[in-house]
Each structure stands twice: as structure tokens, then as C-alpha cells.
Amino acid sequence: MMKLIVVFVISSLLFATQFSNGDELESQAQAPAIHKNGGEGSLKPEECPKACEYRCSATSHRKPCLFFCNKCCNKCLCVPSGTYGHKEECPCYNNWTTKEGGPKCP
């Protein structure tokens, strides 16, 4: 009898967690985007700080990331989606390089 109760409790917990995780996934999918995706000119200059704040949110070098991201955004009027990569979304942002040939924009 005790085994039956333990199996029932474990099954109930697994069933409950399955539904609670599904609700979280739905709410994440319906959340509004932090900034627009798109190519060059898809942002207005006043939208750059918020887009760069998100772009630089995962780096340990936050201050230089924000400086260069805002500089690039003000020139290109776009910031790639996500916190890393996706530079193909914004050719100007992707192709602007330093004198040494490295990427200027984070």
C-alpha cells in the first residue's frame, strides 16, 4: 500500500511540473521583442540605447560593449538580435572594422 501512495505522489508531482513548464514556455513565446530585428535603418537613433543594453547584457566587458554598440547603432541604425552573433542581419554593423581589420561593433 505504501508503494502505491509513493508512486501516486511522484506521478502527481511530475504531472504538475509538466503543466507549469508549459505555461512558462507559452509566456516566453508571447513576450514582446526587446528591439526590432531588421536591416540597416530599422531603428531610430533614440532606440539605440535600449537595443544596445540588451545586446551587451551577457558580456563581462559591459562599458566598452555599450560604447561601441551605441556608436555602431547610431551610424548603421540597426543592432543584430540576441546578445552575440547574428551580424548578418545588419551588414553595416558587420562590415565596419578597425584599422587592424577586426570587428568594430560587438
UniProtKB/Swiss-Prot annotation:
GO terms for cellular component: extracellular region. Keywords: Disulfide bond, Gibberellin signaling pathway, Secreted, Signal. Pfam families: GASA. It is found in: Secreted. Six disulfide bonds may be present. Residues 1-22 form the signal peptide. One of its GO terms (biological process) is gibberellic acid mediated signaling pathway. Its main location: secreted. Belongs to the GASA family. Gibberellin-regulated protein that may function in hormonal controlled steps of development such as seed germination, flowering and seed maturation. This is Gibberellin-regulated protein 12. It comes from Arabidopsis thaliana (Mouse-ear cress). The gene is GASA12.
